Structure formats: C-alpha cells, structure tokens
Amino acid sequence: MKAIIVGGGIAGLASALALTRRGWQVQVLERAPEFAEAGAGLSLWPNALRALDALGAGQPVCARAVPAGQAGIRDAAGRWLSRDDTTELARRFGLAVMIHRADLLAVLATAVPQEALRSGVTVTGVRPDGTVLHSAGESRADLVVGADGVHSVTRRSVWPDAPAPRYAGYTSWRVVTPPVPVGETSESWGRGERFGYVPLPDGRIYCYATANTPEGAPGGGLAELRRRFAGWHDPIPALLDAADPGAVLHHDLYELPPLRTYISGNVALAGDAAHAMTPNLGQGACQALEDAVVLGDVTAAGNGLAAYDQRRRGRTQMITRRSRRIGAVGQWASPAAVTLRNTALRLLPSSALTRALAPVLDWAA
C-alpha cells in the first residue's frame, strides 16, 4: 500500500513515521528545499509524549528536550496572577517538556526512511481518488494525507467549499535569545498584549509575544517588540536586549473553523490542515502527533478513514474552542475587563487548572 504525505512538517513527518511502522510505502512531498525548520520553542505536553512513545520516538525526543519547570501567569508589572501546580500536573498526567521545533523535526525526519523524503516539490492539487498533482508531475496513492498547514492546498482542492482560516484578532512574534537568567517560567498578560518566555535545553530562551492588531499589519520586528514590552517586568527587557533582530519571527494567528469531516475518498487531513488552532494551550503540535498515531492505528486495523474522522474531529475541535477562549481572555484590552480578569485569576485555585486541562491531557495512544 502506498501513501503520499503532502507537507513535511510535524504532522507530515509523524504521519509518515506512523504509516511506515505499519508497513506502508510512504512518500513525503515538501515544497521547501530541505526538511528543516527555523521555528522556535515548542511545548510537548504529556499527551504528545505518549503519542511519540507510540511512534517509537519518545526517547530520542526527550533526550533533546528539557522538563517543563514551574510556571504561571503574571501581570505586566510582574505580580503573580496564578501559578501552575506542575508537581500535581506531572503526577496526574505525566511529564511535559520543552524542545526546539527544529530538534523535534530532526528526530522525526531521521526516523523516516530517507528515500521517502522529497523536498523541493510543490503540490498544486489533490483529488479524492488519491491523485496528487505537483511540480514534478503527477502521483497516485492508496492514501493521501494532507498535512500542509493552515492554508492547505489539499483542503482547498478536495473541499473547495470548506471555510477559510479565520484571523484570531491578534498577531504574534517569536524569537530565541542567548542564555539570560529568567528564574521561573511565566507568561505575562497586559492590556491586549502578552509576553512569555521558556528556557530551552541548551540554555537559550524561547520568547513569544502577542498583540491585538489588524490582520496583515506590519510586524515591526524587534523594534516593535521593544516598543511594546521594554517597560514590562524583568527579565523581559534583558531578553529583548539579548535578542538578534534577524531572528524575530512574526506571524498573524489564525484558526480553522470546524470542518464537517477530515476525510474524503482516499484523502485525510492532519495537523493544521484539519484543525489549525491558536497556540494558547500549546496543543498544535501535540494534536498533530495524536493525529499520526490514530491514522496509523485505523489503517492497520482496516477500519477505514471513517474511524480516523470519528476519533479525531470532535477532540481536536473541542481543543480549538478552548484555546480560542483562553486567547480571547488573555487579549482583553479594556481596563475594567483586565482588572476583573486579573482579580479572578488571583482567586482561582491551582486545582482548577488541573481540572480544566484534564480533557486535553487525558489521552492514551
């Protein structure tokens, strides 16, 4: 049986690995000239690590990762609004780790047969019968996995009437800085702006920020980050001072409205192509890894793609909704609303977070 994977990101490589382990002949088509990722930091929650274990990649990924430390939410002045009970989270759900996105991709790419990886190939169309049109010609497969991101060519080809990605209302910046002492990990919430930082395994710091802006507004790079956040609490000014202007990544944030199905004929969608979500729960990559495991399971069991759709669509769309709601509250800009939000966070027990995360993290391969 032959499978073509459209897209060589996390969803694509994980799907290729899952299918290869089930005996499929796999080909991954990636439009970039090489299978690499500039990217930044990435959180892998316990559900993702269970998925990686099921793919046989858990150990090499954890060898390149660092366990998530104490964390919480602050205001722009540095006052704690809430702290995560990471000990209880780990006891209840398992370990969470931080890794550089490029390191995760490297592990996945190494685990897939190298002859299966075809870079520099741009897919221009996909048909439900398993035909893939691309810059190198035309290919046919028993299964096509559209893992080509939020603006998926696969989705637009097979589901031309599917809803377009929806702008979340805020934009994002990401940058990895040289090592800077940061103490506890935190995400700080202001008025329509947020800034977070997390140590990576090599001592560098992954920083991310969001701000309410019109869709398509210029990002402004490091200068804009400094303008917005240089007056926030330590160590944010030091992190911005240490950042390389050329390393700042800027992207508007989108989510995909719920699709009626993730499958059609011999085609299945995975990752952001199926359920692009805002990053507020840190679940985008985690859900892509779950997709891959389930895809491998249902094809091995001979249950057909309907079982994949049944197992994945409701769960991923639930997580997309939860992530949207968290982001909406985090991006509140009205002074009265921000005061109310911050007061509520201070009063909320850490056990409430554990309960809220249970439907997301309680997943078994």
Regions found by a protein language model. Give the residues of each.
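Conserved N-terminal helical subregion
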Residues: T20, W45-W159, P163-V176, P214-R226, ...
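Short phosphate-binding/catalytic loops that engage adenosine nucleotides
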Residues: W24, A57, D234
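Conserved FAD/dinucleotide-binding core of flavoprotein oxidoreductases
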Residues: S82-L105, G137-S139, P178-L249
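Histidine-centered metal-chelating micro-motifs
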Residues: S152, S172-R174, E193-G196, A274-H275
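Conserved mid-domain beta->alpha element of the FAD-binding
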Residues: G8-P33, V145-G146, W173, P245-S334
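C-terminal auxiliary extensions adjacent to catalytic cores
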Residues: R346-A365
